[in-house]
Amino acid sequence: MNLHQPLHVLPGVGPKSAEKYAKLGIENLQDLLLYFPFRYEDFKTKQVLELEDGEKAVLSGQVVTPASVQYYGFKRNRLRFSLKQGEVVFAVNFFNQPYLADKIELGATLAVFGKWDRAKASLTGMKVLAQVEDDLQPVYRLAQGISQASLVKVIKTAFDQGLDLLIEENLPQSLLDKYKLMSRCQAVRAMHFPKYLAEYKQALRRIKFEELFYFQMQLQMLKSENRVQGSGLVLNWSQEKVTAVKVSLPFALTQAQEKSLQEILTDMKSDHHMNRLLQGDVGSGKTVVAGLAMFAAVTAGYQAALMVPTEILAEQHFESLQNLFPNLKLALLTGSLKAAEKREVLETIAKGEADLIIGTHALIQDGVEYARLGLIIIDEQHRFGVGQRRILREKGDNPDVLMMTATPIPRTLAITAFGDMDVSIIDQMPAGRKPIVTRWIKHEQLPQVLTWLEGEIQKGSQVYVISPLIEESEALDLKNAIALSEELTTHFAGKAEVALLHGRMKSDEKDQIMQDFKERKTDILVSTTVIEVGVNVPNATVMIIMDADRFGLSQLHQLRGRVGRGDKQSYAVLVANPKTDSGKDRMRIMTETTNGFVLAEEDLKMRGSGEIFGTRQSGLPEFQVADIIEDFPILEEARKVASYISSIEAWQEDPEWRMIALHLEKKEHLD
C-alpha cells in the first residue's frame, strides 16, 4: 500500500463514502492522514467551582433529581435534571434529545460534557459519557453526510493499518535536533490522537515549523531567482502622460496614494526588478494607484496584466479601468470565455494589440503568450500559490511585480511574511467619504433593526446579511443560512426581494446572484461565505453580521468594507451576545474605529494572548495549521534557518539539505 492510493482501498470506505470525503479535499490516504482536527474537546473531569463562564468541560456527579422532558414549540424540547458534585448542586439541560432520559438514573454517577453558564449555575449538555474517555478528543471540520464518529473511525483504521509509518520525513535530522522537533510520523499521529496535551503541543509545533519553513524556503528561492535573472526591465514611462491622466481624474489622489504611486513608479524606472507589496485599507483607493502604474507601463511601450481571484472581480476591474483609460485597448481573459472568444482575446494579447490585460488564473495557463509584458499586478496575492505567481512572472522577460492586499498588516509582520518584498502603504481614506457607522446589538434587539431596515430599503438601499459561522459543519452553516433567508423572506414579503448565497453553489451561480444584487434585482443578500473582497455594490449601505463574535477583527473589518462604497451614509450592525471578554472587546473595538491599521495592531495584541481567529480573508498567506500572526516567533526561526540554507553555495547538492530540495520540487509541482 502507498499513501497516494485512493481512499476507498481502506476497509469500510466504499466509493460512495469516498465521494463524500472528496468534498473535504480527502482523495487519497495521504490527504486523510494530513487532515488534522481544528480543535480538541478536553474530556478531563473538572470541578464545577473552577469553571469560567462559557467554558466547555466534563463535569461528573450524582444524579439527585429525576430527568424530566418539557416540550415547547414545534418539535422542540428540553431534558432537565440535577447533578451533585461535592456540596455543589447544578442543573443540566439537554435540548432536543429526549431519548437520553432512559440513560439518566436517580442516584447514579454520571459524567456530562457541556457548556457552563455561570449566571444560571447550569450546564448545557452536549454528550453523556458512558465511560471515562481519552482526555483529548479531536474535532474535525465536516461536510454533509460525514459525522465526527465516522471520520474518527476511518482515521483510526488508517493508523491500525500502519499507514502512518509510510509518512516521509521532510526535515533533516540536524533541524529536528536543533529545534527539538518530533519526527513527522510521530507528529501526524499525535495531531490526531495525542496521549496528553503536552504531546499535542509538541506535534503542533513540529507541523507549524514545517509549514512556515517551506514557505520561507520558497520565498528565498524566488529571491535568489531574481538575483540570478539579473537586472529588471527599465520602464521609461512618460512623466507628461502620467501627469496628464492624474490631472484628468475627477478627484485628487490622497497623500498616501501619491506616495505609494511614486514608490512604484520609481521602481519601474530603475534597473532592478520590482517586487513590491501594496497594502491599503478597504476603500483606500488601491485600484486607482494600480491603474496609474499600468498606464505608466503602457507609456513605456509595454503591456500590463492584472490577475484577480474571481471572475466577478475581473469584470469589475475591467469596467473601472475602461472608464479610467478610454483610449487604451483592454482585454478580459477568464475561464468562462467561449472557445472562439478566447482565441480572439489570446490573439490580441500575443500581437500586442491589448495594452492592459485583466483576468483570473486564466492569465497563467498554457497558450497565453504576451507580446511585451512589463508589469504584473496580483490582487489579493494570498489567494495564489507561490508557484502560480512564478508562472505569471515567467510569461514575460522578468517583468516588474506588484502585489496588492485589501487588509492592513502591521509592517514588521508584512516584512517577515513576504520575505524580500518592499512594502507600500495607503493609510488614508479619500476625502469626502463618510465613515461607516457601526453598532453592536444583542440578539433580542434584532426586531427593532428589521423595522429600521424596512425604512432603509424604502429609501432605495440594499442590505448584506452574513449568516452565523459554525466551523465544525458546513451542513449546519447552510441550514442556518436557509432558515435565516426564509425568516427574512417572510418578514419582508411584498416589501423586499431576498437572495441566498452559500459556499456549496457553483461559481457561475454565485456570480449570477452577485450580478443580480449589483443590478438591484434583489434588496437583501444573505450569505454564509465572506463576500468577495473588493466586490463593489455602491448601493449596498447596510451590513448585518449575525453572531459577529465568531469572527476575528480582520474578518469583521473586511465584511464592513463591503458597504460604504457610494456617497450615501452606510451602517454595519454587529449582532452578538458574546460570552467571553475577548468577544466583547472585539465588538467594542469595532464600534470605536474604522481604521484598519488600528484594528490590525489590536488583532495582533489579542492573538498574542492565545486568541485564535482564522487568517482567511486576512491578506496573509494561509496554512493548514500555522497562523502567521499567532506563530510569529516560529516564523522568525523558520526565516533565519531558510536564509542560512539558501546562502550556502549549491546547497541543493549538499547531502544534509538534499531532502529539502526534493520536497520543494514536489511542492512546486503541487502549486
UniProtKB/Swiss-Prot annotation:
Recorded catalytic activity of this chain's protein: Couples ATP hydrolysis with the unwinding of duplex DNA by translocating in the 3'-5' direction; ATP + H2O = ADP + phosphate + H(+)
Region (Wedge domain): 44-134
Residue spans crossing the bilayer: none
Chain's role: Binds and unwinds Holliday junction (HJ) and partial replication fork DNA. Unwinds R-loops. Plays a critical role in recombination and DNA repair. Helps process Holliday junction intermediates to mature products by catalyzing branch migration. Has replication fork regression activity, unwinds stalled or blocked replication forks to make a HJ that can be resolved. Has a DNA unwinding activity characteristic of a DNA helicase with 3'-5' polarity. Complements a recG deletion mutation in E.coli, restoring UV resistance and poor growth in the presence of mitomycin C.
UniProt-listed PANTHER family: ATP-DEPENDENT DNA HELICASE HOMOLOG RECG, CHLOROPLASTIC
Family named by the database record: Belongs to the helicase family. RecG subfamily.
Subunit record text: Monomer.
Record protein name field: ATP-dependent DNA helicase RecG
Provenance organism: Streptococcus pneumoniae serotype 4 (strain ATCC BAA-334 / TIGR4)
